[in-house]
Curated annotation (Swiss-Prot):
Keywords: Cytoplasmic vesicle, Endosome, Golgi apparatus, GTPase activation, Membrane
Domain Rab-GAP TBC stretches: 597-844
PANTHER family assigned to the protein according to its UniProt record, in alphabetical order: SMALL G PROTEIN SIGNALING MODULATOR 2-RELATED, TBC1 DOMAIN FAMILY MEMBER GTPASE-ACTIVATING PROTEIN
The protein's role, per its UniProt record: Interacts with numerous Rab family members, functioning as Rab effector for some, and as GTPase activator for others. GTPase activator for rab-2. In association with ric-19 activates rab-2 during dense core vesicle maturation in cholinergic motoneurons.
Organism whose genome encodes this protein: Caenorhabditis elegans
Alphabetical list of CDD domains matching this protein: PH_RUTBC
Gene deletion effect: RNAi-mediated knockdown results in neuronal dense core vesicle trafficking defects whereby fewer dense core vesicles are transported to axons of the dorsal nerve cord.
Major place of residence: Golgi
Subunit structure: Interacts with rab-19. Interacts with ric-19; the interaction is direct and may be required for the activation of rab-2 and dense vesicle maturation in cholinergic motoneurons. Interacts (via RUN domain) with rund-1. Does not interact with unc-108 (GTP-bound form).
Effect of R707A: Interacts with unc-108 (GTP-bound form). Disrupts dense vesicle maturation in cholinergic motoneurons
Pfam families: PH_RBD, RabGAP-TBC, RUN
Designated name of the protein: Rab GTPase-activating protein tbc-8
Length: 913
């Protein structure tokens, strides 16, 4: 180690003439990784070696070393081309990420539209638009028309685009439609290459155009080869367009009378470079969903009327749009959407200032399936008054009354309804045909008790099948009977009695049918009771086999009526560090968490005790000094190793450049560290092994630290990133055999943000890793967590268990892998992460359960029961849904549900014992 100490720790930072290869690795494992490499290198140049000098600035190489490079300020056109290429790479990356989780992509997807916009911007760069005035509009579509005569794929795309434009089936501009169709026909890369090679097209471009660039122009065509490999599908029905996770959750809370069929896979909402594009995309999804409620290619619109009033709260009426649709299977659906929602959906989503009010409007939408309706009540005071329609389903539940304007609107609706019901159903009584061959309401039969004053016109229509002919009600006249009124029937009319034989025969048949129905009901009740008992026994067996060890029944804390830990309680508890105060502290953290005026300061003092770093009756001052001293000693030790690693990285860089320049005839070993003349003593071997292990971990840490929570204000400061790097280096140096695994930085970051003390953060992180290390790859802890979660779902929510049972066992709950690996750090915001971690630590210290994270995962899944079951999610849908819901969960609700699950399991286990 003496040879290392002669060099300063900052030796590797010295600026020396060196070489850097600025190119991407063409041997990436997948297209997505290749595109990632392209997007990371925004200053991409040709694949060649560039000489660097002392005047340049420092830049980290692929292995983390710092080399001196020379930077020249590009001109404005060059910068613009770089921006266009960067946006194009981002959109291609999003497309390929979507394709990696799906078998196909919707051609109307916002991701495809965003890619078309980026491609159109690249094609239009440097275009002399004044030379294209012979065409209708100077756009990329004009260039397609120019090459269509000499290029077969371009002509095919042009014909397809014209057909779509004539049918007007798309709302996007025509200069984007042809790009989308070229993607669908997998010929976009070929067409762009023809743009570059065609002399008739090149004359329309300036010399500084992107497509005329000898390198970047071809790069655009090459990049488009990846999206052309994706399988696209046309989905003209707007209801099949993908909804976001928030819309699915809102739809589940609204509730609907109709059964929602299986939904296509979800899309990932990603952030793009333009905020306006994101707003337009979200508004488009909401607008299309509202329009799809009334217009669909799978249904026929029979009737539509605006400004139809519906009683919402008591006597309050809201106006909206009502439509009657008939689907291809013969079913009819009546839908009503408030005007506020129709108007709001036509505006960008940023226009919704009050999300709560907008959500309440969504809850007022009505969807009635006519096959469930048996009665329709019509009430009208007189001919100049509005008409009220009320629908009653087979369970006797009435819908909100629909108020149609005065006039013939109610008759028009009933006529459309009667037409749509045929031939399977009909209205009873049917509508009459008047003298003008128009439908009219049936005439009520006049009664002798009628008064001279006009009464309300009340009708009750039944929906009956056409196969059975039933007698008309007594108060409705026969439309075929003569108009003259028959004499009234007197009450003293007498009829002959029925035959006793017939009466007895009918009674026996009725009794037999009733007995059969009762026996069937008895069998159903017995079967239901038996299967309920069988399910209960199976659940108890699952608890005995898999879940008995999850909770401790000796510690039953049922008193949840307590206050959170704040500054006042913390001072009182630390003033008298008794065992009772410690239990009270842990109980408060478990039930109510840590709150207060300065919550961060309270957490900074309380977390070391929660993690078990300090004993409750111990003062932390003396230990903190010891931690700090040991921490900086470890830093001095690994700085020597770091300097040697950086030096070897630079040597490897120069050696690789020399090998490429020399171009040897025969292949030699590429390991520049091997030296056959080196001694092979055990001491030297240990030193080399130490450097090799530390070098491998150092490079992995550097990559993860650079991308760790950069959206957080705390880590936008480079000094804090260096603190994170130092703490991670020190931990790995202390635990070099275990090494660094991706995800450790995610666990370390919240601790560093809270403590802002590197030595204390390292000690707490070491204790946290003692519990989390078993869940990392190559350890059995994660498999146990997923198995226990599966067993809990089987007991708590059999419907979700049946849903995941249809999925491959190895993949069923793999979306929860990241949950348990990082204790939900990436699923929650930082503040929610603090709350969940505190409860997990408190539950472990109270010996309630060592696996509270499993119960929190159970609460996360069961909280979205309606969304998962209603949409019949598969494995891919679940991954996308929970990825979209990241940092949007109701943390307090999930914690409360998790505590309830723990308490219920404790009671069951105690009952079994």
């Amino acid at each position: 180690m003496q040879m290392f100490r002669h060099s300063s720790a900052d030796m590797w930072r010295a600026k020396k003439p060196t070489l850097e290869r600025r190119s991407t690795d063409g041997r990436r494992s997948s297209i997505v990784d290749w595109i990632n490499g392209l997007s990371d290198n925004n200053n991409y140049k040709s694949d060649h070696w560039v000489e660097k000098h002392d005047e340049g600035c420092e830049r980290m190489t692929r292995n983390g070393s710092v080399c001196a490079v020379e930077e020249s300020e590009p001109d404005v056109p060059t910068q613009h081309r770089e921006v266009l290429l960067t946006k194009l790479k981002i959109e291609i990356k999003n497309i390929m990420a979507e394709h990696g989780a799906k078998k196909y992509l919707n051609l109307n997807s916002p991701y495809v539209t965003s890619l078309c916009i980026a491609v159109d911007a690249c094609i239009m760069d440097g275009l002399r638009r004044r030379l294209l005035t012979l065409f209708n509009s100077p756009s990329s579509m004009s260039l397609l028309q120019i090459i269509a005569k000499s290029n077969g794929p371009a002509q095919q795309v042009l014909d397809q685009t014209r057909e779509i434009e004539e049918l007007r089936t798309s709302a996007i501009p025509v200069h984007l439609i042809w790009i989308r169709e070229a993607l669908y026909l997998k010929s976009l890369s070929t067409i762009i290459n023809h743009f570059i090679d065609s002399k008739s097209v090149r004359r329309y471009y300036d010399n500084s155009a992107l497509l005329l660039d000898p390198v970047k122009g071809r790069l655009v065509a090459t990049l488009m080869m990846a999206p052309c490999m994706v399988t696209y599908r046309r989905m003209s029905n707007r209801i099949e367009q993908e909804a976001t996770a928030e819309e699915l959750v809102e739809g589940a809370t609204r509730g609907s009378t109709s059964t929602v069929p299986s939904r296509p896979p979800l899309s990932i909402t990603r952030q793009v470079s333009s905020i306006a594009a994101s707003v337009e995309r979200n508004g488009s999804v909401s607008r299309d969903y509202v329009f799809s409620l009334h217009h669909s290619c799978k249904s026929t619109l029979l009737y539509g009327k605006n400004n139809v009033c519906v009683a919402m709260n008591g006597s309050d009426f809201a106006k909206g749009y009502m439509s009657l649709q008939k689907f291809y299977d013969g079913n009819l659906s009546l839908k009503w959407v408030p005007n506020q929602l129709m108007h709001a959906s036509s505006q960008p989503s940023s226009g919704h200032s009050n999300n709560g009010e907008f959500t309440n409007i969504w809850k007022n939408t009505i969807n009635i399936e006519m096959q469930d309706i048996i009665y329709i009540h019509l009430h009208q005071k007189d001919e100049i008054s509005p008409t009220c329609l009320t629908f009653v389903n087979c369970e006797g539940v009435q819908s909100a009354p629909f108020q149609l304007p005065a006039g013939q609107h109610s008759i028009a609706f009933l006529s459309s309804l009667e037409t749509g019901l045929a031939p399977l159903l009909r209205l009873d009584p049917p509508l009459w045909v008047g003298t003008t061959k128009e439908k009219i309401l049936p005439r009520l039969r006049k009664r002798s008790t009628a008064v001279a004053n006009p009464a309300m016109l009340d009708y009750v229509f039944r929906l009956v099948r056409t196969s059975g002919v039933e007698p008309a009600p007594e108060d409705i006249e026969d439309p075929l009977a003569p108009t003259s009124h028959s004499p009234p029937i007197h009450d003293n009319c007498v009829s002959l009695p029925n035959s006793p034989y017939i009466v007895d025969n009918v009674d026996s048949i009725v009794n037999f049918q009733i007995g059969t129905a009762c026996q069937s009901m008895r069998n159903q009740i017995m079967a239901r009771a038996f299967y309920g008992w069988l399910t209960y026994v199976r659940h108890l067996r699952t608890i005995r086999t898999h879940l008995l060890h999850l909770v401790d029944t000796k510690t039953l804390i049922c008193d949840d009526d307590c206050d959170p830990v704040d500054e006042k309680f913390w001072k009182q508890a630390r003033a008298e560090p008794t065992e009772e105060n410690e239990k009270e502290f842990l109980k408060r953290v478990y039930w109510r968490g840590i709150e207060g005026i300065n919550t961060k300061e309270v957490r900074r003092m309380a977390w070391p005790y929660l993690l078990g770093l300090f004993e409750w009756n111990e003062s932390p001052e003396s230990r903190l000094e010891q931690f700090t001293s040991q921490y900086w000693q470890d830093i001095e030790e690994w700085r020597v190793l770091e300097a040697e690693v950086r030096r070897r990285d630079e040597e490897a860089f120069r050696a690789a450049r020399a090998r490429k320049a020399a171009s040897p005839v025969r292949e030699e070993s590429c390991d520049v560290f091997e030296d056959p003349n080196e001694p092979t003593c055990s001491q030297h071997y240990d030193r080399e092994n130490l450097i090799t292990l530390f070098r491998a971990n150092l490079h992995r840490i550097d990559k993860d630290v650079e991308r760790c929570d950069r959206n957080l204000m705390f880590f936008s400061n480079k000094d804090n990133l260096e603190s994170l790097r130092r703490v991670m280096y020190t931990y790995v140096r202390r635990n070099l055999e275990e090494g660094y695994t991706q995800g450790m930085c995610d666990l370390l970051a919240p601790l560093l943000v809270t403590f802002e003390d590197e030595a204390l953060t390292l000690e707490c992180f070491s204790l946290l890793m003692l519990r989390q290390r078993g869940k990392f790859p190559q350890r059995p802890g994660m498999s146990k967590c997923l198995l226990n979660l599966r067993s809990l779902i089987q007991v708590v929510d059999p419907q979700i268990y049946a849903l995941i049972s249809d999925i491959d066992y190895a993949q069923a709950l793999s979306f929860a892998f990241r949950w348990f690996l990082l204790d939900f750090k990436r699923e929650l915001s930082y503040e929610c992460t603090y709350k969940v971690w505190e409860v997990i630590w408190a539950a472990q210290r109270l010996r309630i359960t060592d696996d509270f994270a499993i119960f929190f995962g159970l609460a996360t899944i069961t909280n979205y029961h309606d969304v998962l079951i209603t949409n019949n999610f598969d494995y891919t849908d679940m991954i996308k849904f929970f990825n979209e819901m990241a940092e949007r969960h109701d943390c307090s609700r999930l914690l409360s549900s998790a505590r309830t699950h723990v308490k219920c399991l404790q009671n069951l286990v105690q009952h079994l014992k």
